[in-house]
């Protein structure tokens, strides 16, 4: 594999460490817990001329192997309707209000999960000293069925702490 992609994967795993996404643990009882696989997704970020400016690697959970009642319970997360966004923008324009758009880097990696979820070590980054261990998730991973809900709950709690009301 090319060094640029290895660096991109290492950067992704550094985000996991910074966000305390997981911890390496002994493999749990397979009758009580499912071990969800992981895989790498690769993408080139390009500038306006189509030139590659950055390689991006994202580690995702193979959420299609999750078992309801074991790996997840609640998955619903509300999404803003296009009409609501249009009304907000019209109101902002009419009242000459300055509106900012922001992006949260690795948003789902900030969402705390309630369930006990275990994932396999990432392909190519298995711990040689502990090959039989797995990661217990503290926060959501892209691909998990409950990831959007976990991020929504985290964002909602943050906004409430700043005085916003639902």
Where are these regions (language model features)?
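Long, low-complexity, charge-biased intrinsically disordered regions
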Residues: 1-166
């Amino acid at each position: 594999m090319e060094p640029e992609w290895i660096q991109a994967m290492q950067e992704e795993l550094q985000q996991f460490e910074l966000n305390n996404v997981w911890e390496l643990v002994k493999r749990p009882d397979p009758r009580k817990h499912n071990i969800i696989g992981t895989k790498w997704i690769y993408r080139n970020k390009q500038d306006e001329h189509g030139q590659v400016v950055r390689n991006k690697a994202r580690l995702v959970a193979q959420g299609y192997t999750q078992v309801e009642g074991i790996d997840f319970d609640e998955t619903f997360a509300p999404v803003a309707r296009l009409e609501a966004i249009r009304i907000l923008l019209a109101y902002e324009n009419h009242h000459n209000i300055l509106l900012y758009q922001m992006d949260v880097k690795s948003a789902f990696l900030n969402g705390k999960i309630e369930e006990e979820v275990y994932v396999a070590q990432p392909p190519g980054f298995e711990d040689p000293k502990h090959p039989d261990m797995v990661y217990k998730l503290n926060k959501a991973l892209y691909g998990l069925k409950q990831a959007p809900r976990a991020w929504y709950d985290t964002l909602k709690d943050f906004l409430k702490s700043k005085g916003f009301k639902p």
